[in-house]
């Protein structure tokens, strides 16, 4: 019984690592599914701009940091009504060279997606 108590106690004290400041700027890769196809994106982010490279397509978005682990992106040159909507990104966990995050259109809490970005520079 004491052993079970200790396991539960230590498990409840575990906090996922979140060194978000290490991933505020840099060059990253993110792989996701789009229309049943795997797409690899490379993006470069500084404190205020995110430049996303997908194939030969380049998208630029402004970045507004809410706190160390959360930011809002807005495309600077949206080509559709959907692209005009801001995207909220929250870093959930970090490790040595990557972070896991969730993202959604601002205000759409029902359709959150998750992904992992790897820092390459």
What is each stretch, according to the model?
Residues 73-96:
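An anionic, turn-rich surface loop/hairpin at beta-sheet edges
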Residues 1-6:
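Sec-dependent signal peptide recognition
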Residues 62-70, 91-98, 119-121:
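A short, structured loop/turn motif at beta-sheet edges
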Residues 38-66:
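N-terminal glycine/threonine-rich, aromatic-flanked beta-hairpin/loop signature
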Residues 14-16:
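Bacterial signal peptide processing site
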Residues 9-12:
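C-terminal motif of bacterial Sec signal peptides marking the signal peptidase cleavage site
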């Amino acid at each position: 019984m004491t052993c079970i108590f200790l396991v539960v106690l230590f498990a409840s004290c575990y906090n996922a690592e979140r060194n978000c400041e290490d991933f505020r700027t840099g060059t990253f890769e993110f792989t996701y599914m789009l229309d049943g196809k795997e797409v690899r994106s490379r993006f470069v982010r500084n404190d205020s701009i995110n430049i996303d490279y997908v194939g030969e397509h380049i998208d630029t978005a402004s970045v507004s940091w809410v706190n160390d682990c959360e930011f809002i992106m807005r495309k600077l040159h949206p080509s559709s009504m959907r692209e005009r909507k801001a995207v909220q990104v929250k870093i959930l966990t970090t490790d040595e060279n990557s972070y896991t995050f969730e993202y959604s259109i601002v205000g759409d809490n029902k359709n959150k997606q998750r992904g992992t970005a790897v820092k390459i520079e």
